[in-house]
Structure formats: structure tokens, C-alpha cells
């Protein structure tokens, strides 16, 4: 048993609990009842902290520290691993393949059994002999001067003094460092922290009949020095690469030895040289720079930074546009969409070096200038490169992501993409869905040699792909960027990775793994969770899903209500025991005693939106009618295209049309009927703020009105306080000892940082003078400490405040304190606060 005594973290009421080890345990209860406080903030935090304390103090300073949870004791605890939904990697270089490490196994497989092809003609290529190299060099024009180079250092940092000493001892006279030839007797400038390429000059020759013997000897020497590699510097021409490994006899192309790093898009040896392994480029988009092409330039059609002054007749920008209009015979008052393509090309891409006469009158006088116009796109591109980081972020709102022209989104250089296994290169393999890959790996044809070498690697790949398939992610591809995954998908990927790691004796803490998962895939997930338990692990799952609760070995129901009214253990036991427990609301729903009523009469729509020809991601050119004025649910199995339709097409297109947002909608032909709406609002689960200074009162805007009330009291007027006095973000009214935080951080170096209440204000955030001002007997601190439920009664006679409070209560947040830091709110709570903020506004009926 894991024995917990006196857990008091957040809203937990000093609870004692025994959780069975090596079992599948579900923590359930109302939103905000304290499930996460017990599972993550208490059990996981303590398990992680104890593991950290077993490390040396030197190691601990690099790993960061964990605060000791507010609990008397926890016995029988294993090392804990948390699999939550928040820690998704947003790095564009991170993919499903890299986070699961399956891609690392594929890199190894392709390096060991892959068949290289010529990137130019596509023919399989094999190793070159010394004779073939001699023949190739003898084909050069007579009297061509060449240098035979042995590449001995490639892309490595350091001063490499020993390399130069050994070369000198061996009798060599010259080396080429980073493209420059140096004499070994001179001092060679080397930057220690820069990557260098070093080649020894083995021989220098002039191509002419009769040098074959010397050339053969020199080539053999070079190949021995550089492990079968040779570079030939043709003076006045290009450098030729030779290898005893692979070369194309037809095209004369030699490629490097195939290594695992050749297939890494995070390594210069494998990455596409144009996009550096990202697979895409950021480019300025005409549709974002000129969002409304029905407008003329004079009316402000050009919206991109640096060009808004085109509406000002006295600006230099307008003078250039006037000059172009005279030269190319168009009118700046004409709508942009009506210009011929030639005029659009001149405006966007420039005059191609042709100069136009610009008449400009500025502060220093007037003049005539001959200007070769570079084009709006090139101009803003230059401004973007020269801009500060903040301005770059602004410019990027006018840019879109386009696939790289060189690698077509496959991230790798052409030589790496030319290596195949079972007639597929590594990018094509990773573009298959997990479900397709399971079948392909079972049926793909390999030679006996390939099977022998790749047996162990393939075994690992098949096992890990199988785990992904088992958690209901059969629709994902290994090339999918992790930044595009939902919280539930990212969590299930980490779950599959943990099963692949094969750890035993661990306490896994999971946060609603079934979220976003279709019922069809739920059985797969539950089977996977049981497999993880059967390995010898303890599973603690925070969950509301009925199937998961019924499948669990043990359930802990926390409640009875949320927030201040929760934090107690209501019931424990098996699903059957919970159903029989009269105190458990969860049990009443599981047993069917309480049900959510299905409406007998449905509302009728007030109109329809029609999406025509939706083709984003996996959508098959579909037309969809969405009724307006009613509650509509878009559903389907995981990966069916729901988010592509709603988030990528519908939201982005309507945001662009109605909110003038700079968004690029997903691929579709048209949306009909949006003239019936006046705005669109997206409410997701992202935090309402990133710091403890953000809270429900500040987010909903109600704190401004509360501060106005305090500023209007007699005490405040007598002391000359304005509303700014009641802000904990400004000097004046806040406690300066803690800068309005209410807590002080004490750094303990090798121990966790300790947060203690401020000794001056005792955690109240404000100074004494500010706290003396009372409204209806309450200070500003007292108001921030109220729950939404209490605030509804307190502000019942102030409609503008009570309306917002009642809306927060109606979405089930009556237990949340007005000043509760946003960092303490769950994703669901943050989403409901956003929803309440919108619902409390006066409705136009067209949102």
C-alpha cells in the first residue's frame, strides 16, 4: 500500500488515504475537487522529490528542485513518472518519430541495410575502386591542375594541433583548413569553439598522359589516410568527392559513407541545406499583406508593416508608388484585384533593375531620384531580416509556412533521401500512418543479408509501432510535428514510449488519458494501461471516463463538491462498492441512479453556414452544412478530420473575414452564409495567464470595476487614492517588500527554493494604508480571497459585477477564488473562465 497521511496541498482537508500498489487506480470527482492536488501535487511531487534527493548535491543543482508537498508522510512510494497533457514539445524539430525514439531506430536501419541510389539519375550505386577513380581523373582536360586531399577532420570543434603535428611528422607540407590552403610550417589560425574541416594535401598534379602510376599511388595513400575518402580540388573548377564506398559511374557523383547521422534532420550531415532540416520556409504571403484586394492602394490595400503610409500622399512610400503608376500606366485609385498581372508583379516583385523617376518633397527640400524598385515582397523581407526580435514577431503575422523547394518538406538532403529500404526512403516510411506501417513492416521484402543485419532493429521498431497502435494513435504519422498534437494525443504518445521503455516498479500518474479519444479506441487504451500495470507498476489515473472507471482495480472518489467545499475522500473501493456508496455522486451516475436528461424537443436553426470543398489534411473535398443558432457537436473517430474542418478551415476563414485576423485558412473552395455572423470566438484550454499575477478577476475584467468601487469609497476619497492604488502590479498601494506577490522566494541553492508568506503584509499583497480602505466592511484583499459564490451575494446590487460572477458560477466555477493565480487553474477551468468572460458580454445574437 501507498499510505498518505495529512495531505493538505491546495484544497485538500488533511486527508489520510491508502492506495494499493501495483494496481490500476482511478482518482475521480468533480472538477476542482482536489484530484490533481492529490495525484500530481502530492504523490508525484513527493516521489520525484525523494528521487532527486538520492542524487548528489552537484547533480541536483542542474536538475532543478521540487518543493516538498504539504503532507505529513507518504509511505511505500515508488519513483514517480508523470504523464500529463501540458508538457507538449513545441519545438518545430520535434516529431512523433523523434519523441518516441522510433526514428532513431529507423536511422540505424537505413544506415546498415539501406541501398544508396544516385540522387541525380536514381540508379543504385556501389563502391568505387582505385582504378575507377584514376580513370575518372584522367578524363579531365589535359593540363588541368589538381590537388589530392585527404579529409581527416569534418565538422569538429577544436584547435586540432595534434592533427597538424602528425601530418608534419609524416612528411606532408600543406593542409587545407575550411577551404584555405596553409603551409604546415606556418601558424594556422584556428578558433577553438568553431567547427572545422581539415584536409591534408597529399599530392599536386597536372593531368597529362603518363601520370597514371603516380596518380594510383597517391590515391591509395589518400584513401588510407582518410578511411576510404578522397577529395580532389580541381584548380579553377569544382571539388570532386570520391569514396571507396558509393559513387555513380554515369553521373560521376560520389556520396559520403552512409551513417545514422546522414538521416538526422537535426544534424548538418543529414539536414536539407536550404531549410536546415525544418522542411518548410517562412515566406511573406500576398493574401496576408493585401488581405482585402477589393480596396485600392490609395484606400490602404497594403497592410504589411512599412507600407501603411501608402495612403499618405506626402510620404516617400506614396512617391515611389506614384512613380510606378506613371511608368506602368495604372491608377492607385483602382481596386488591387483589377490590376493586370504585369502590374501586380511589378508591385510585388520589383522592376527587375529598371529605374523610375521618383518626385519627392520632404523636410529637406524636394528632388527627383532614379530608383530601381525592388518590390514589396523583397522590401519587407529585407526589413524583416534587419528587425529586432519584437518586430520580427510582428512581421511574421504576414508570413505563411510553405514547404521547402529543395526537399519538398522531407527535411533531409537529397543524398539521404536517395537511400531506400523495401523501395521506400526514410521520409516516405515516416509519412505512412502508424496503422499502415504495422502492415507494411510485416509484409516488406528484404534480402537475406538485410534480414540478418536488421533483425534486432526491426524487432524494436515493430514493438514500438505496435504500442502506438495500441493506444489508439494508428492515424498518426511519425513525421507529424509534436506541436500540432492535442494534449490527449501527446499524453498517449508518452504513454506508448513508457511501455516501450519496459520499466517496472514505477508509480505512473496520468491526467485524463482518454480525453479526445473516440469510444472505439477506448478499449485499446484501457488494454494498454492494464499492460503497463501487469509489468509491475502502480497506475494512478485522474479520470472522469465511465469505461476507465469500470475497468479500474480501485477507485478513489474525491469531493463532495469543488474548491473550498471539496478536498475530502468521499468513497474508496471497486466500481461496485462506489456504486453502492450513498455519499458518492460519481457512484450515483455510474449506477444509473442519476442521469443527464436528453432534451425532448430540439431547437430549430436560424440559418446555415456551408463549407464547400474542404480538402485540408485528410478531408476528401467535402461539403458540410453547419446550422446556426443552436448547439452543434462535431464528432468522429480520432484523426477523422474534425479539427481540420473546425479549427483549420471554419475558424481561420471566419476570423479572417469577420475579425480581420491575419490567418491563412486550410484548403477549401468557399464558405457560404458567413454574412449572417458578425464575429467568431475560439475558446481553448490554453492558460488565461502565465504568471501568478493573472487571475479570474483580472481576466474577466471585473477587477477594474472592483478597484473603481474601492476608489469611490469615502476613505479612499479622503486619502486621495485613485483606482491605481488598489492594483498589486503598481507601486503605491501594493506591499513593496514582496512587490505585490504576497510571498517571498528564498533560494536554498542545493535544497528546493522555499516560498514563505511576506513578513510585512502576511501574504495580503497590499500595504497597511491600502488595506484600511473598506467597501461594505471588506478590504481589497478580502474581496480577492472570496469565492465566486460569495462574490455573487456580496456584489448582488452591482449588476455589471454580479452578471460576470453569476456567469462564472453558472459554468461550474462557484468554488474558484477571485484572486486564485492562473498557474493553479486546470486547462478545463481556464477554458470555462474564458467561456464565462464571453457569455457575460451582451450578445449580438450573431456570434
Regions found by a protein language model. Name each.
Residues 1-847:
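Conserved phosphate-binding elements of NTP-dependent enzyme cores
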Amino acid at each position: 500500500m501507498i499510505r498518505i497521511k495529512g495531505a493538505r496541498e491546495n484544497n485538500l482537508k488533511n486527508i489520510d488515504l491508502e492506495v494499493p500498489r501495483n494496481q490500476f487506480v482511478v482518482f475521480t470527482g468533480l472538477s476542482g475537487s482536489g484530484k490533481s492536488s492529490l495525484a500530481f501535487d502530492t504523490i508525484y511531487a513527493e516521489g520525484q522529490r525523494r528521487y532527486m534527493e538520492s542524487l548528489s548535491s552537484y547533480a541536483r543543482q542542474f536538475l532543478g528542485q521540487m518543493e516538498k508537498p504539504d503532507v505529513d508522510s507518504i509511505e511505500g512510494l515508488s519513483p514517480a513518472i508523470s504523464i500529463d497533457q501540458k508538457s507538449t514539445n513545441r519545438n518545430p524539430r520535434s516529431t512523433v518519430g523523434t519523441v518516441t525514439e522510433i526514428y532513431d531506430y529507423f536511422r540505424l536501419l537505413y544506415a546498415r541495410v539501406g541501398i544508396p541510389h544516385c540522387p541525380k539519375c536514381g540508379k543504385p550505386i556501389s563502391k568505387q575502386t582505385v582504378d575507377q577513380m584514376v580513370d575518372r581523373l584522367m578524363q579531365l582536360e589535359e593540363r588541368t591542375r589538381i590537388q589530392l586531399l585527404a579529409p581527416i577532420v569534418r565538422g569538429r570543434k577544436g584547435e586540432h594541433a595534434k592533427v597538424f603535428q602528425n601530418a608534419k611528422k609524416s612528411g606532408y607540407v600543406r593542409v587545407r583548413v575550411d577551404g584555405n590552403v596553409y603551409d604546415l610550417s606556418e601558424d594556422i589560425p584556428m578558433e577553438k569553439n568553431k567547427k572545422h574541416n581539415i584536409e591534408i594535401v597529399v599530392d599536386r598534379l597536372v593531368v597529362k598522359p603518363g601520370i597514371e602510376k603516380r596518380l594510383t599511388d597517391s590515391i591509395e595513400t589518400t584513401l588510407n589516410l582518410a578511411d576510404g575518402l578522397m577529395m580532389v580540388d580541381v584548380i579553377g573548377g569544382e571539388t570532386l568527392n570520391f569514396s571507396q564506398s558509393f559513387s555513380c559511374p554515369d553521373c560521376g557523383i560520389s556520396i559520403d559513407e552512409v551513417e545514422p547521422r546522414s538521416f538526422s534532420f537535426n544534424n548538418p550531415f543529414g539536414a536539407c541545406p536550404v531549410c536546415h532540416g525544418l522542411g518548410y520556409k517562412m515566406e511573406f504571403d500576398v493574401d496576408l499583406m493585401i488581405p482585402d484586394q477589393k480596396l485600392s492602394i490609395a484606400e490602404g490595400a497594403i497592410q504589411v508593416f512599412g507600407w501603411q503610409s501608402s495612403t499618405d500622399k506626402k510620404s516617400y512610400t506614396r512617391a515611389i508608388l506614384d512613380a510606378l503608376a506613371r511608368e506602368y500606366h495604372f491608377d492607385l485609385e483602382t481596386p488591387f484585384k483589377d490590376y493586370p498581372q504585369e502590374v501586380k508583379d511589378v508591385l510585388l516583385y520589383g522592376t527587375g533593375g529598371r529605374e523610375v523617376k521618383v518626385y519627392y518633397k520632404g523636410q529637406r527640400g524636394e528632388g527627383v531620384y532614379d530608383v530601381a524598385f525592388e518590390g514589396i515582397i523583397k522590401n519587407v523581407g529585407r526589413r524583416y531580416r534587419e528587425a529586432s526580435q519584437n518586430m520580427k514577431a510582428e512581421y511574421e503575422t504576414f508570413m505563411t509556412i510553405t514547404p521547402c523547394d529543395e526537399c519538398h518538406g522531407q527535411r533531409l538532403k537529397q543524398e539521404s533521401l536517395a537511400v531506400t529500404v523495401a523501395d521506400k526512403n526514410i521520409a516516405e516510411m515516416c509519412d505512412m500512418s502508424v496503422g499502415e506501417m504495422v502492415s507494411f513492416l510485416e509484409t516488406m521484402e528484404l534480402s537475406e543479408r538485410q534480414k540478418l543485419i536488421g533483425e534486432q532493429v526491426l524487432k524494436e521498431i515493430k514493438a514500438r509501432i505496435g504500442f502506438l497502435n495500441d493506444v489508439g494513435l494508428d492515424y498518426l504519422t511519425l513525421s507529424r510535428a509534436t506541436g500540432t498534437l492535442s494534449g490527449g494525443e501527446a499524453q498517449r504518445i508518452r504513454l506508448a514510449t513508457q511501455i516501450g521503455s519496459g520499466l517496472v516498479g514505477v508509480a505512473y500518474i496520468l491526467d485524463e488519458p482518454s480525453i479526445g479519444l473516440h469510444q472505439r479506441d477506448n478499449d485499446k487504451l484501457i488494454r494498454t494501461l492494464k499492460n503497463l500495470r501487469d509489468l509491475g507498476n502502480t497506475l494512478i489515473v485522474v479520470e472522469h471516463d465511465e469505461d476507465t472507471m469500470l475497468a479500474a482495480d480501485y477507485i478513489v472518489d474525491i469531493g463532495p463538491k469543488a474548491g473550498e467545499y471539496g478536498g475530502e475522500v468521499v468513497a474508496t473501493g471497486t466500481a461496485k462498492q462506489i456504486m453502492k456508496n450513498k455519499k458518492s455522486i460519481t457512484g450515483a451516475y455510474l449506477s444509473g441512479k442519476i442521469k443527464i436528461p436528453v432534451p425532448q424537443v430540439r431547437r430549430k436553426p436560424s440559418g446555415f453556414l456551408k463549407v464547400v470543398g474542404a480538402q485540408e489534411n485528410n478531408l476528401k473535398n467535402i461539403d458540410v452544412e453547419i446550422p446556426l443558432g443552436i448547439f452543434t457537436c462535431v464528432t468522429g473517430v480520432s484523426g477523422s478530420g474534425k479539427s481540420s474542418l473546425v479549427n483549420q478551415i471554419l475558424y481561420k476563414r471566419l476570423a479572417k473575414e469577420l475579425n480581420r485576423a491575419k490567418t491563412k485558412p486550410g484548403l477549401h473552395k468557399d464558405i457560404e452564409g458567413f454574412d449572417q455572423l458578425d464575429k467568431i470566438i475560439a475558446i481553448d484550454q490554453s492558460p488565461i495567464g502565465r504568471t501568478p499575477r493573472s487571475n479570474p478577476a483580472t481576466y474577466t475584467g471585473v477587477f477594474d470595476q472592483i478597484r473603481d468601487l474601492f476608489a469611490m469609497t469615502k476613505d479612499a476619497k479622503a486619502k486621495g487614492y485613485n483606482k491605481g492604488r488598489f492594483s498589486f502590479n503598481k507601486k503605491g498601494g501594493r506591499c513593496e517588500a514582496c512587490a505585490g506577490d504576497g510571498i517571498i522566494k528564498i533560494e536554498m541553492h542545493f535544497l528546493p527554493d522555499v516560498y514563505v508568506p511576506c513578513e510585512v503584509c502576511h501574504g495580503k499583497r497590499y500595504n497597511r494604508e491600502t488595506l484600511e480602505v473598506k467597501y461594505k466592511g471588506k478590504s481589497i484583499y478580502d474581496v480577492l480571497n472570496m469565492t465566486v459564490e460569495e462574490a455573487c451575494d456580496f456584489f448582488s446590487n452591482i449588476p455589471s459585477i454580479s452578471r460576470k460572477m453569476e456567469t462564472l458560477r453558472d459554468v461550474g466555477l462557484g468554488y474558484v477564488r477571485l484572486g486564485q493565480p492562473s498557474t493553479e487553474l486546470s486547462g478545463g477551468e481556464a477554458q470555462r473562465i474564458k467561456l464565462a468572460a464571453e457569455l457575460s458580454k451582451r450578445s449580438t445574437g450573431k456570434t
